Amino acid sequence: MKWLWVLGLVALSECLVKIPLMKIKSMRENLRESQVLKDYLEKYPRSRAHVLLEQRRNPAVTYEPMRNYLDLVYIGIISIGTPPQEFRVVLDTGSSVLWVPSIYCSSPACAHHKAFNPLRSSTFLVSGRPVNVAYGSGEMSGFLAYDTVRIGDLTVVAQAFGLSLEEPGIFMEYAVFDGILGLGYPNLGLQGITPVFDNLWLQGLIPQNLFAFYLSSKDEKGSMLMLGGVDPSYYHGELHWVPVSKPSYWQLAVDSISMNGEVIACDGGCQGIMDTGTSLLTGPRSSIVNIQNLIGAKASGDGEYFLKCDTINTLPDIVFTIGSVTYPVPASAYIRKDRSHNCRSNFEEGMDDPSDPEMWVLGDVFLRLYFTVFDRANNRIGLAPAA
């Protein structure tokens, strides 16, 4: 049995492609330094959980929350066109559309980012189909196009992507990325459009129909997206597999959330979404308020919760039980210290929806602790302690 396990690891790691991710200053810090954070949070109080509810109510519209990118610090580099034009993008498992700014974009936000020039690409094709992605702070509108997309050493031909003509105002002006590359299931995106990862598999560019994330908490470099395989040197022990409960988002069943052996949320089970496009741990408002009270976090006027920094050394782990396996999140992970040495809670309020089971979004706070494999071939998620 041991040899079968070793051979399985070899198969998973064969011919995989590693895409380095850059760790950067968060947009929240940019907004705070420009003294516009409070105004932004008051005007756009939407999180990924709000958008999940909106998308259920109107599945014909592609919704994306912009607030969930506020604390994002991981981006990757891709290129589009022939010769290649380079862009910094969020690699987002919570969406499935690829879009970047175009030179025809009239919004002030586009002036702060690299823009794709179709006239400089010999492989560019325009479809004429409009693209609209609704965000919490406005709407990205543009048009659909096709071109060669390169990610690492892999080249996808005739990839559909969106080119923006207008972008949401203040948020994208302060964004540290140019666009978004979605890694979610196809039904999250535009009807009839094949996402980038699906084309990597369909065009025979990767040996396994899966990808994995390793997010480093220490260095500017070291974080990694793995395409088509898994490198076991990035995690400890064995991967524990959990089935995807609803193949759209990378969604799974969570057994419970506990502290000091007592269930404090998700009593009787709930749903969780593994989301690289979300930085924090987001849950129903009632559950988050309870957790903030338990850890002694106090609300500020802008929706954030503050704690005394010395509590990092005294507060207990908060434990997520998934597939009967426990995944502790220590205080050093669920509390963050900013550049001004203020400490904030990494739990964020979503919303309560009486018509739906309790929904959580497990963002980078969780994913930094646990190496995560997204297995499309078997509709499952693998988790193991990160190395």
Curated annotation (Swiss-Prot):
Propeptide stretches in the record: 16-62
Tissues expressing this chain: Expressed in glandular chief cells of the neonatal stomach. Expressed in yolk sacs of the placenta (at protein level).
Compartment(s) of residence: Secreted
One MF annotation (Gene Ontology) recorded for this entry: aspartic-type endopeptidase activity
EC category name: hydrolase
Task of the protein: Shows particularly broad specificity; although bonds involving phenylalanine and leucine are preferred, many others are also cleaved to some extent. May play a role as a specialized neonatal digestive enzyme.
Family as reported in the entry's similarity comment: Belongs to the peptidase A1 family.
Protein name according to UniProt: Pepsin A-5
Source organism per UniProt: Mus musculus (Mouse)
Gene transcribed to yield this protein: Pga5
